């Protein structure tokens, strides 16, 4: 905050389960930083939604990976579709700016059109999606999750149609090319964005395993300098190059490499 950080996003895991969540929200938002919350939506009670509105958060992004209860609950095995939809409605009723995020899988790509329609009907101002990344828990179940090439073709065809349909009313934003294309762009034009992990380590970007600092030992100002220099580190350039031959290297993103 003292460094005039303009934008903060709280994600997880699930940030709203933290006992100090609203203390952090109200502290950050009350000192001029724009704040985004990425949540599963199940904790967006009317009371919580009103507090987010009162704190003037910039947006709340909810993961809604299906347009039906059957599909959503298959994806989010500990979630409940009706609770998430109600949470979205609570946030909308409170006047909280809403975004919807959708992760494509073998069993939910066919619902993308309905999901975009639902997002608009629920009051979202933006809808985000793209190709599912080979990382995290998805690595263990990739054979069950990854859409086929044919499914992706139809998926993005529908998204292009929906983007045109909702132009001027809701932004439908999607990354069609995948993580490798994004990493190539980042090497040329790094985003001014740090990823701070719960343990204080700071990553260059979520899709790469590189650490540029530790907030328990270094100041944010020093880490920012490290961040700017790190994108030219030969290790990172080589890692992105290796991804061209082995896209599954993204599975290594939790094997921390300090630069």
Task: Annotate each PLM feature.
Residues 44, 107-111, 239:
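Short, conserved alpha-helical segments within structured domains
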Residues 18, 47, 70-71, 75, ...:
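Residues that scaffold the ATP/ADP-binding catalytic core of kinase and kinase-like folds
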Residues 59, 79, 119, 227-230, ...:
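Alpha-helix boundary/capping residues
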Residues 53-55, 63-190, 195-203, 207-218:
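Radical SAM enzyme [4Fe-4S]-AdoMet core and its adjacent flexible, acidic
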Residues 1-59, 148-151:
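Conserved alpha-helical substructure of the radical SAM core
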Residues 205-259:
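Flexible mid-to-C-terminal extensions adjoining Fe-S/redox cofactors in radical SAM and related proteins
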Residues 28, 37, 62, 200, ...:
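Conserved, mostly hydrophobic/aromatic
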